[in-house]
Amino acid sequence: MSASPSPSITGLLLAGGRATRMDGADKGLQLLDGTPLALHVLRRLSPQVDETLISANRNADRYAELGAPFDARIVADETADFPGPLAGLLAGMRAARAPLVACAPCDTPYLPADLIARLHAALDAQQADIAMAVTVDAQHARSPQPTFALLRTSLADDLAAALAAGERKVRAWYARHKTVEVEFRDERAFYNANSWHELAALARR
């Protein structure tokens, strides 16, 4: 999609976490095949949305540089204690110019090219508040992927209240709203790097 004065979907790259399992390193800036993970994701996410935001609580200048080719804006959490992806999601919902926000984490370089289209179709068909990706493996086991989702920005005030009340679990907050699950059979598309070992594994895939 191309940017427009009244976009319909805002893409949100979630890059604001602590990365405790990577010794605090900024995950989105780690290299895969010589390219920062965040840039891999931006190249796949941005063509699917009308505007792009990057949720980043540190290294904002570096993320702004990576996001420049996509006219991406940087947003930071409203709180300084790294309360998790819900805080990044809230910052994105507040900053979005569109009525819908599509989020994806910064360490998933193979996300599907049809991710947003499929989430949007399900959201509309079910008149849901949230559409969330779920992977299904060869044994039909389902694995929810809550940070791959499409949400209505009208939920921002409720999310702010939930965060203020201490909620930190993404799926627990989703459960308060009408959420539709969208199945994806390509597990590889959702592989991520939560640790140095997983980053090395990504490079071998």
From Swiss-Prot:
<protein>
    <recommendedName>
        <fullName>Molybdenum cofactor guanylyltransferase</fullName>
        <ecNumber>2.7.7.77</ecNumber>
    </recommendedName>
</protein>
<comment type="function">
    <text>Transfers a GMP moiety from GTP to Mo-molybdopterin (Mo-MPT) cofactor (Moco or molybdenum cofactor) to form Mo-molybdopterin guanine dinucleotide (Mo-MGD) cofactor.</text>
</comment>
<feature type="binding site">
    <location>
        <position position="107"/>
    </location>
    <ligand>
        <name>Mg(2+)</name>
    </ligand>
</feature>
<dbReference type="Pfam" id="PF12804">
    <property type="entry name" value="NTP_transf_3"/>
</dbReference>
<comment type="subunit">
    <text>Monomer.</text>
</comment>
<feature type="binding site">
    <location>
        <begin position="14"/>
        <end position="16"/>
    </location>
    <ligand>
        <name>GTP</name>
    </ligand>
</feature>
<dbReference type="InterPro" id="IPR025877">
    <property type="entry name" value="MobA-like_NTP_Trfase"/>
</dbReference>
<keyword id="KW-0479">Metal-binding</keyword>
<feature type="binding site">
    <location>
        <position position="77"/>
    </location>
    <ligand>
        <name>GTP</name>
    </ligand>
</feature>
<dbReference type="GO" id="GO:1902758">
    <property type="term" value="P:bis(molybdopterin guanine dinucleotide)molybdenum biosynthetic process"/>
</dbReference>
<feature type="binding site">
    <location>
        <position position="27"/>
    </location>
    <ligand>
        <name>GTP</name>
    </ligand>
</feature>
<feature type="binding site">
    <location>
        <position position="107"/>
    </location>
    <ligand>
        <name>GTP</name>
    </ligand>
</feature>
<comment type="similarity">
    <text>Belongs to the MobA family.</text>
</comment>
<dbReference type="InterPro" id="IPR013482">
    <property type="entry name" value="Molybde_CF_guanTrfase"/>
</dbReference>
<dbReference type="GO" id="GO:0005525">
    <property type="term" value="F:GTP binding"/>
</dbReference>
<keyword id="KW-0342">GTP-binding</keyword>
<keyword id="KW-0808">Transferase</keyword>
<keyword id="KW-0963">Cytoplasm</keyword>
<keyword id="KW-0501">Molybdenum cofactor biosynthesis</keyword>
<dbReference type="InterPro" id="IPR029044">
    <property type="entry name" value="Nucleotide-diphossugar_trans"/>
</dbReference>
<dbReference type="GO" id="GO:0005737">
    <property type="term" value="C:cytoplasm"/>
</dbReference>
<dbReference type="GO" id="GO:0046872">
    <property type="term" value="F:metal ion binding"/>
</dbReference>
<keyword id="KW-0460">Magnesium</keyword>
<dbReference type="GO" id="GO:0061603">
    <property type="term" value="F:molybdenum cofactor guanylyltransferase activity"/>
</dbReference>
<keyword id="KW-0547">Nucleotide-binding</keyword>
